[in-house]
Amino acid sequence: MIKLNINGKDFTVDADPEMPLLWAIRDLLGLTGTKFGCGIAQCGACTVHLDGQPIRSCQTSVGEVGDGKVTTIEAIDGKVAQTIQAVWTEMDVPQCGYCQSGQIMSAVALITENKKPTDADIDNAMSGNLCRCATY
């Protein structure tokens, strides 16, 4: 049994410690906002926050999480998250939407840490997120 704190709630899941966090989030907890894209931490669709930092949940095992606090797209809140989500919609960013949760999670982490990022900061923070339909 593995103990996880997801979105501020404590869970105990019956999982092998090597199970990717992504599958615990989606299959065991039913939180499907976090997407599976490539499975090799290259596309960013599976991005969640671990203690406020963006990580790729497809390559992070539940055993690696330890006492960390995981936040998924379902639970991001606060002014930064609300602003990013509003601008995302206002600027018609979503097309197919597959990359959207990972893109938003990376953007929220960036703006939370750096209120005035440069173009280079933005490129660096978002470079791990790929968009299948190329609308980003």
Task: List each model region and its residues.
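Signature of N-terminal electron-transfer/Fe-S-associated modules in redox systems
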Residues: 1-136
